[in-house]
Amino acid sequence: MTRLASRFGAANLIRRDRPLTREELFRVVPSVFSEDKHESRSERYTYIPTISLLDSLQREGFQPFFACQTRVRDPGRREHTKHMLRLRREGQITGKQVPEIILLNSHDGTSSYQMLPGLFRAVCQNGLVCGESFGEVRVPHKGDVVSQVIEGAYEVLGIFDRVEEKRDAMQSLLLPPPAQQALAKAALTYRFGEDHQPVTESQILSPRRWQDESNDLWTTYQRIQENLIKGGLSGRNAKGGRSHTRAVRGIDGDVKLNRALWVMAEALLTQLQ
């Protein structure tokens, strides 16, 4: 899932097939260790310490294997800017279909605190961010929020069984071509809007590897997600000229698109079951 932070470059991103050390985190994502909010924040802004949350999750058996933070021009914001950690249970970091926790935070007002359940598929390095129905935790930096954050962590830890149940249900549901086209159309409309879509439904339904040739809902969803997020598809712009679709870059755009696609697939599952 390096694409989640592809715009930030190597200096702001680290990934390993093992738990990251404190030294590695401090070198690449110093904002995780910030001890206070940025000086630009008011008295009403509540500092939520990422490192304390990380300590709590590690006590529950979760370890960070990926970390990134936003590039900033102002050196004074480097230790406060938006950052993201991805964590998995210690023995599952290199697993094939692995539930994980995605943690987003900042100390300078650029992001609320968010904790999202995710599901990782090793075959194409997709990271699927599950939608609102799975209990996303989002906490603004206001008031007495530390207890909310800790409770939210346990809430996310408790939903992985439901995520895997949804995955299994999607894998068992074969989609007829009209349903595949409908899902692809909805995804294109979300990604590019209604006025002009540079590529066709068939293009984003096309598999990039033989493992993705199945027509079940889960695999169809995977194909759509990868084609939209990686980009590079040949198409036509609004004036009729040749173009290629752009990859989705940055933390926010990736998470929003992932969540929207999950909700679409989930709605189709409910409709067809």
UniProtKB/Swiss-Prot annotation:
It holds the Pfam family DUF932. Belongs to the UPF0380 family. This is UPF0380 protein YafZ. It comes from Escherichia coli (strain K12).
